[in-house]
Amino acid sequence: MAKDIKFSEDARRAMLRGVDQLANAVKVTLGPKGRNVVLEKKFGSPLITNDGVTIAKEIELEDPFENMGAKLVSEVASKTNDVAGDGTTTATVLAQAMIQEGLKNVTAGANPVGVRRGIEKAVATAIEELKAISKPIESKESIAQVAAISSGDEEVGKLIAEAMERVGNDGVITIEESKGFATELDVVEGMQFDRGYTSPYMVTDSDKMEAVLEKPYILITDKKINNIQEILPVLEQVVQQGRPMLIIAEDVEGEAQATLVLNKLRGTFNVVAVKAPGFGDRRKAMLEDIAVLTGGQVITEDLGLELKTATVDQLGTANKVVVTKDDTTIVEGAGDSTQISARVNQIRAQMEETTSEFDREKLQERLAKLAGGVAVVKVGAATETELKERKLRIEDALNSTRAAVEEGIVAGGGTALVSIYNKVAALEAEGDVETGINIVLRSLEEPVRQIAHNAGLEGSVIVERLKHEAVGVGFNAANGEWINMIDAGIVDPTKVTRSALQNASSVAALLLTTEAVVADKPDENGPAAVPDMGMGGMGGMM
């Protein structure tokens, strides 16, 4: 296919037009008085959102050169979202400011390579200073503040703070759509896996259709149980002790299943069988997790163990087990705490080594089940459109909170970026490197300027006053007051601000050093005409 090529100034100007179109659509959402953007959907109702990365991903421009510029800034938003989970609008605003200022200087004769070195030098100093003014997050109130600022909703802040307190830093918090109007929190205590009873006749509560076992023995195996004779010796030992039993196996079927159900209905003993969770190697790992949690052993041929020789000592125990048709929950497993923490550390090490995002997610789930817990935030709203928008905001808030726990917090509302202005301005350089530093300095002001602009105020006046205020003091655009941002709970996670600055500078520096852009030429003939299917002689059809 023929290519269209643009060079130097033409190329950079075309890309800047694309950058501006995307950034202008995204930056209206910044700050407490930011607006929403409506996105057309081919199917269903439009999506109304103020999430920067969601808007950026939707934008496709007709001109291929402009589209390339837009896609570069979209990547800034996506990368920031991947690393920190929030701050995508801030990253877009920073990138636009750096690109605009940079192109002005390159057009005026500055050397792009020198400018790039200046940008990199300034950003490195800015990140060091951000870390220096960062404060660790300690209390539940601080967590609630971070989540409330990100989502723009205090109730969401409290909900996420409670979820994180209940499940801990190793826990998993998932966000689901609720059937009702209210947004609520559901926390699963203990280890839960998505396998239910193999027969409904095993339930102990026929109203709720669930089986509740108090202080049961737990047989864990990766084998199929077809013949009751295989587990009869260990069953007899459990019956003698008068305690219920949970069997976790690859499957329980045929004569074994029938015998267990019959004895359960007769009241001889209380037993529930469930299928083992997961598949393949993941199943083996999850069974081992259950064994460690309950203080039992996995009866498997890999270890030379057989069901018919199993004893009560090899079974796990727990305070309580609840089994429904879909899930099994083990509460307060009786495993040794040192073995559990060793297993947790082993999973953490695997998480650090793996390069697969899917594997990391599954390892995180296993870690949560062993060390923390699982919390589900059920999002409710009056309409589907509001539900989607609310869900996106809560996801942002959750990501922000995790980032804050990881690297601490700085003053919000763009204040932190202006607080480090003087330290970056003190860098010594000359020529084009100095120009690069000045480009970063100008961009550090831009988030505050945009937040003020969205609130209907003059951004430059706010920025100038902010430069002379004490560290941490900033402008609250929600009510127009000058306050200590951290004391007022207007905070941003350090990781979010850092990622936004790093990713924006990376793409800006690359775009400034671009000298040629190559794109496909549009097909002037348009799509090929559909051939006549020879249906002309069928005029008599009704």
From Swiss-Prot:
SUPFAM superfamilies: GroEL apical domain-like (SSF52029), GroEL equatorial domain-like (SSF48592), GroEL-intermediate domain like (SSF54849). GO terms for cellular component: cytoplasm. This is Chaperonin GroEL. Residues 522-542 are annotated as: Disordered. It comes from Listeria monocytogenes serotype 4a (strain HCC23). It is an enzyme of class 5 (isomerase). Forms a cylinder of 14 subunits composed of two heptameric rings stacked back-to-back. Interacts with the co-chaperonin GroES. Keywords: ATP-binding, Chaperone, Cytoplasm, Isomerase, Nucleotide-binding. Together with its co-chaperonin GroES, plays an essential role in assisting protein folding. The GroEL-GroES system forms a nano-cage that allows encapsulation of the non-native substrate proteins and provides a physical environment optimized to promote and accelerate protein folding.
